[in-house]
Design a protein with these regions (language model features):
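Juxtamembrane intracellular "pre-TM" segments in multi-pass secondary transporters
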Residues: 9-23, 200-233
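Residue-level signature of mid-helix packing/kink "hotspots" within the transmembrane helices
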Residues: 69-77, 161-162, 264-268, 272, ...
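Helix-to-loop junctions at the C-terminal end of transmembrane segments
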Residues: 75-87, 270-282, 369
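Helix-breaking motifs and short loop linkers at transmembrane-helix boundaries and internal kinks
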Residues: 87, 108-113, 282, 304-305
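Structural signature of the two symmetry-related core transmembrane helices
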Residues: 90-104, 185, 285-299
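Cytoplasmic helix-loop-helix junction between adjacent transmembrane helices
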Residues: 120-157
Length: 404
């Protein structure tokens, strides 16, 4: 008979308790991922038209997204410090508040300056949110199971896009901006709700790995980031295409709501399948075909007057982009030192790459669209993405599980 004093009983209960905490935290992370990205996608697809209505041209609409991304990038290097001071629950809740509250002020903003100011505040929240999501999720699972965990996290992100992006366009075309902004604030509230799945305190969600974290020096940072360079470059290029597609397809194609819905839907399935393939075969074997499919789908954005071709391209873009996100994130995490500090640093680097690419695409795409139209913008973006495969890859991660 096992009594409560039996060490085996205490150990078993500890394992059950730890598993319940992990499930609770992962569930909270998925709720937060859905809410945060639903809010993000609603406004990403609606605000360009709102900015144009306020007197800005395509370049002004692109600059609005670029402001959001610039603010996001500015806060991300400080997120490990923030997580250590506030803890996971409070950090995630803060990100939801910063992401959602400015949305309520958007109906009163009618100038590009005011819109950029609110976008900057939202960018602070988004920057904290995206680093928290991928870092906290990764910390919950050992390296061998991260592909599927990241796949599920990415699926939640994709479902948010399936609902958020087309709905934002549809509401903008009805000029139902007040409803759009209220929905963006409400879905951001789910980030705050999801934060309660995490325990109080500042400790990592799982014990630190066997490697001790390097001190944060310029030399140490470069050494830790150097093995990640290849996946990070691919991430920047792929999200540049993402910024172009999701900012400018709504301005160039009448079938934009259907196209973005198709892209987001295919991305959900691709993230789940890619997670399984990555755990089985390694991220590098998934990455190359995923990049090529993304480039092909991006080029199809030039078919603004051919709905069938545009929709087919959108399906390809979503499938390729979803797989690229899962593969690059897993590869970056594999290149990091195990432990909370190393994984946190990798999470920051990957998210900076994501947001930098999105900002580059939305900012540079406006002048290119004005100069050459869709036939110049989308194929040029696709060619730049595909050309990156010609760049020699960096050395393999020190503790990669490739080639299983």
């Amino acid at each position: 008979m096992i009594t409560p004093a039996d060490p085996a009983a205490r150990t078993g209960r500890g394992l059950v308790s730890s598993d319940l905490r992990r499930r609770s935290a992962f569930g909270g992370a998925l709720i937060a991922a859905f809410g945060g990205f639903a809010s993000f996608n609603l406004l990403l697809s609606a605000l360009p038209a709102y900015a144009v209505r306020s007197g800005a041209g395509p370049s002004g609409a692109g600059a609005l997204t670029a402001t959001l991304m610039a603010s996001t990038l500015a806060v991300q290097p400080f997120t490990p410090w923030l997580f250590a001071r506030l803890g996971r629950r409070n950090s995630l809740a803060l990100s939801g508040a910063l992401l959602g509250l400015p949305s309520l002020a958007l109906p009163a903003a009618s100038t590009l300056t005011a819109l950029n100011g609110l976008a900057a505040v939202r960018g602070l929240g988004f920057g904290i949110f995206v680093v928290a999501g991928v870092t906290f999720t990764t910390e919950l699972f050992p390296a061998a199971g991260r592909g599927r965990a990241i796949g599920w996290y990415g699926a939640a992100v994709g479902v948010a896009g399936v609902l958020g992006a087309p709905l934002g366009i549809a509401l903008a075309r009805q000029e139902a901006y007040t409803l759009t902004f209220a929905l963006a604030a409400g879905t951001a509230g789910l980030v705050v709700a999801g934060s309660f799945g995490f325990p109080r305190g500042t400790g990592p969600a799982r014990p630190a790995g066997p490697r001790a974290a390097r001190s944060w020096t310029v030399r140490g940072a470069w050494r830790s980031l150097r093995p990640m360079t290849g996946p990070l470059l691919v991430e920047i290029a792929s999200t540049t295409a993402y910024g172009v597609v999701f900012t400018f397809v709504p301005l160039t194609a009448s079938a934009a709501p259907q196209a973005l819905l198709a892209a987001q839907a295919s991305s959900v399935l691709a993230r789940l399948v890619a997670g399984w393939l990555i755990d089985g075969y390694g991220g590098r074997r998934v990455l190359v075909p995923a990049v090529l499919v993304t480039a092909l789908g991006t080029a199809a954005g030039s078919a603004s007057d051919e709905p069938a071709l545009l929709l087919a391209g959108a399906v390809l873009f979503g499938a390729g982009f979803g797989a690229v996100q899962s593969a690059t994130l897993v590869l970056v995490m594999q290149a990091a030192d195990e432990g909370s500090a190393g994984l946190g640093r990798a999470g920051v680097a990957w998210n900076i790459a994501f947001d930098a690419g999105t900002g580059i695409g939305s900012l540079a795409g406006g002048p290119l669209l004005s100069a050459g139209g869709p036939s110049a913008l989308f194929p040029t973006t696709a060619a730049a993405l595909a050309a990156l495969l010609l760049v020699p890859s960096t050395r393999r991660p020190r503790h990669s599980d490739e080639g299983k």
